[in-house]
Amino acid sequence: MNLDQIQEMWQRDSVIDPDNLHDESLKIPQLHAKYYTIYNTITLLREKAREAYNRVKLERYNYYTGKAPIEVYEEEPFPYKVRDKEALQRHMDGDEKLSKVELKIRYYDIMLKFLEEVIKTISNRTYQIKNAIEWHRFQAGFN
C-alpha cells in the first residue's frame, strides 16, 4: 500500500453524511481500527527499512574502507581505500544504495505522519458529529 492509495481511501472515508449522522458515529471505531492497522503495518515496514539501512551502511562502510570481501570489488570495483573521515562521509552521503534505503525510510515517515493526522481526525469525529447534530437542532428551532 502506498501513500496515494491511503490518501484516496481517506478521501472516501472522511466524508460525513449529514443525513445519517447516527450511522457515521457508529463507523468511528471501524475507521479507527482500519487506519490504526495500516499505521502499525507501516511502522513495522519502517523498522525493517531502518534495519536494512544499518546493514547497507555497514556494507558500504566496509566497501569504501577496503574491508569488504574480494567478490564485492570484482562486481563493483573501487580502486582506493578512503581513510579520511570527511571523505568517507561524502562517499557514504552520495552512495546510491544507501540513499535508496534512506529514501524509503523518509517515505514511510511521511506516510506515518499522514496516518497520525487521519487517526487524530477520526478521534475528533465524535465532536464534529455532535456539532452537526446541534446545528440541525438549532435550525429546527430546538435549543
Task: Label each PLM-derived region with a short phrase.
Residues M1-N143:
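Charge-rich amphipathic alpha-helical interaction elements
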